[in-house]
UniProtKB/Swiss-Prot annotation:
The keyword rRNA-binding does not apply. GO terms for cellular component: cytosol. The record marks T44, Y107 as: Part of a proton relay during catalysis. This is 4-hydroxy-tetrahydrodipicolinate synthase. Homotetramer; dimer of dimers. GO terms for molecular function: 4-hydroxy-tetrahydrodipicolinate synthase activity.
Length: 291
């Protein structure tokens, strides 16, 4: 259903911390013009943890309205509590998003059975395309391939964003699930390797700054041209690394400010990128022809 370079959109903010609707709409237009294959609104990179519920839904709605069906919009609707995830997913449905991306519950650390029941309940209550999101480095929990396989027969669970840092997980999940789910890389630096193993694309931080190159790399890889894809990816390796010099989305918001696209404002407890990293990230932006 979804493939290629799916940008994990930042949420632009004004200097007073309010959401910058104009900059957000401009980002959507830019991504569509640059060839981004899908837009992921209000995930981790979109600062979902510090948005109020009304803001969260408003950002999804703005992205959907501006996209106007030209590319799919995937809404981040994960939450610690299952009932809250259901509420957010239903809200995304109401504003006409195309699918939901649900990070696994964090901090409360559910068991594998708890994860199974959590996602099953969301699927049963929402009947909407769901992409699981596994990122143990943030959630302190790991959605194991065997749990994905238990969920895979549910028609509404269509894929997983795999950000465990273990590229072999792509092959493990596909071996257990076949074509019942699609796997998407959640790690820009490993995206090319993941696609070689059968992933259908990447939910990307790097695409925020270099959308055309990320889309080109994915197009080549999914067409089987890994020589060409490696050549493109070589221009992006600095960004893959340096956009994580500090916690995401701190570096990528600074990068977009450096590119003249938006303010580098974040909400506390996130703070702007330390000046000691500026020149290194600036050089990676130059290498990727972003500035």
């Amino acid at each position: 259903m979804f493939h290629g370079s799916m940008v994990a959109l930042v949420t632009p903010m004004q200097v007073d911390g309010a959401i910058d609707d104009v900059a957000l709409r401009e980002l959507v237009e830019w991504h569509i013009a640059e060839g981004t294959h899908a837009l992921v609104a209000v995930g981790t990179t979109g600062e979902s943890a510090t948005l109020e519920m009304r803001e969260h839904v408003a950002v999804i709605q703005t992205v959907v309205e501006q996209a106007r069906g030209r590319v799919p919009v995937i809404a981040g609707t994960g939450a610690n509590a299952t009932h809250e995830a259901i509420e957010l997913t239903r809200a995304a449905m109401e504003v006409k998003a195309d699918a939901a991306l649900l990070v696994s519950p964090y901090y409360n650390k559910p068991t594998q059975e708890g994860l199974f029941q959590h996602y099953s309940a969301i699927a049963e209550h929402c009947h909407f395309p769901i992409i699981l999101y596994n990122v143990p480095g943030r959630t302190a929990g790991d959605i194991l391939p065997e749990t994905v396989a238990r969920l895979a027969p549910r028609a509404d669970i269509i894929g997983i964003k795999e950000a465990s840092g273990k590229v072999e997980r792509v092959a493990e999940i596909l071996a257990l699930c076949g074509d019942q789910v699609q796997v998407y890389s959640g790690d820009d630096g490993a995206a090319l390797a993941a696609m070689a193993l059968g992933a259908r694309g990447v939910i990307s931080v790097t695409a925020n700054a270099a959308p055309r190159l990320m889309a080109r790399m994915c197009d080549l890889a999914l067409a089987g041209d890994f020589v060409g894809a490696r050549a493109v990816n070589a221009q992006l390796t600095g960004l893959h690394r340096d956009l994580f010099l500090e916690s995401n989305p701190i570096p990528v918001k600074w990068a977009l400010h450096e590119m003249g696209r938006m303010e580098s404002v974040l909400r506390l407890p996130l703070t702007t990128l330390s000046s000691v990293h500026h020149e290194r990230l600036r050089e990676s932006l130059r290498r990727a022809q972003c500035i």
